[in-house]
């Protein structure tokens, strides 16, 4: 689902020069998509239109530079908290050093979303089954 208000804000605003105040990482099937949805409804929080930028885990995206990452935050207000949700940051060891490098002066808060492993595995099985995989 596309948030049209967010799309309008991003299309006419200059790129952001701010890094996120917080990152949310976590296990698959641990409600990161739901959290992203609810946080986008809060007027004091700004999240990228796409939930997972994959910037710190994807070699091609990372090679495009920090400016490419900051483009995802175009339209953030001065008073808004800036965040990103990407579960994969928890699994890719290189992401930690990349985040540490770029956030050296102002480390973000990092929120981990976890779920009971048995319930998570069953939920993943059901999703895979529904998709016919």
Give the location of each predicted region:
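PAPS-dependent sulfotransferase catalytic core
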Residues: 1-91, 101-113, 117-133
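A short acidic, amphipathic alpha-helical/loop segment
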Residues: 95-98
């Amino acid at each position: 689902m596309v948030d049209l208000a967010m799309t309008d804000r991003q299309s006419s605003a200059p790129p952001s020069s701010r890094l996120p105040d917080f990152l949310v990482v976590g296990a698959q099937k641990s409600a990161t998509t739901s959290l992203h949805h609810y946080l986008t409804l809060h007027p004091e929080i700004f999240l990228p239109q796409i939930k997972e930028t994959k910037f710190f885990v994807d070699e091609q995206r990372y090679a495009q530079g920090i400016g490419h990452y900051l483009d995802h935050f175009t339209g953030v207000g001065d008073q808004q908290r800036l965040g990103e949700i990407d579960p994969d940051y928890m699994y890719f060891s290189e992401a930690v050093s990349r985040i540490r490098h770029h956030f050296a002066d102002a480390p973000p808060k990092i929120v981990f979303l976890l779920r009971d492993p048995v319930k998570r595995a069953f939920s993943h099985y059901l999703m895979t089954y529904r998709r016919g995989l």
